[in-house]
Design a protein with these regions (language model features):
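Long, hydrophobic alpha-helical segments that serve as membrane-spanning/inserting helices
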Residues: 1-13, 34-226
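N-terminal signal-anchor/signal peptide hydrophobic helix marking the start
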Residues: 9-27
Length: 226
């Protein structure tokens, strides 16, 4: 006869208790692991934002340089337009110059940055940064295309002599292309600098790498004396 009829149920409750303790330990370990993973990912999001703000500060220098260059471009293109309105035989130009073309890194938005920022800073903030980097890409592409206009205009430096009607027309097309590019790039620069400043990006402290007053495009245009 069993003197302790409750022994088996107590043993069963003990096993259940041990199981619950083990499960609780597993859940706590998983929660800690997930918490650590989330913390590490949040740190990566912070580091990504810091890197992106550094790239945007560098890009602000490019935008400010465009603002400084724009008046010189307007003046030079008008001088070239007037030059092509002259006689059939045109003197060569000593130095036409061109707009500066600077590079800035845009790698911060590549890879997993969009998804990372969306998770830890919200979809709206990720969208804002995406729009900024898209604007940076478009600005760089347009600036590169503008260089082709100026390269063809610099052929007026090569030699004096007759410039036939077809060539004059082509050069006037290049002037129009360079003028439109400058208008667009300057407008983009103005808008993006305002937007970057609204995002607490330091857009003013870094000095410009080029003194435009010393560049040929900002100097009075002179003709080669024969």
């Amino acid at each position: 006869m069993n003197a302790n009829p409750y022994a088996r149920p107590r043993r069963g409750r003990g096993l259940v208790g041990e199981f619950l303790v083990v499960m609780l330990g597993v859940l706590v370990a998983l929660a800690l692991e997930q918490g650590l993973s989330d913390w590490q990912e949040a740190r990566r999001a912070d580091d990504t934002l810091l890197a992106m703000h550094e790239e945007m500060r560098d890009f602000a220098v490019v935008l400010r340089l465009r603002q400084a260059t724009s008046p010189c471009v307007v003046q030079r293109l008008q001088e070239l337009d007037d030059h092509l309105s002259g006689a059939d035989s045109l003197p060569a130009i000593e130095a036409i110059g061109r707009t500066p073309y600077l590079f800035s890194s845009r790698s911060g938005w590549r890879g997993g940055a969009p998804e990372l920022l969306s998770r830890h800073r919200g979809p709206r903030q990720a969208q804002v940064y995406g729009e900024i980097y898209q604007g940076m890409e478009e600005f760089a592409l347009l600036a590169q295309q503008e260089q082709a206009n100026w390269a063809r205009l610099q052929t007026l430096q090569e030699a004096e002599g007759a410039v036939d009607a077809p060539r004059r027309w082509r050069l006037r097309e290049e002037i129009a292309g360079a003028r439109n590019a400058n208008l667009l790039l300057t407008a983009i620069a103005d808008q993006m600098l305002q937007r970057l400043a609204s995002m607490d990006v330091d857009v003013d402290s870094a000095p410009l790498p080029v003194d435009m007053r010393e560049r040929a495009v900002c100097q009075p245009m002179s003709r080669v004396e024969g």
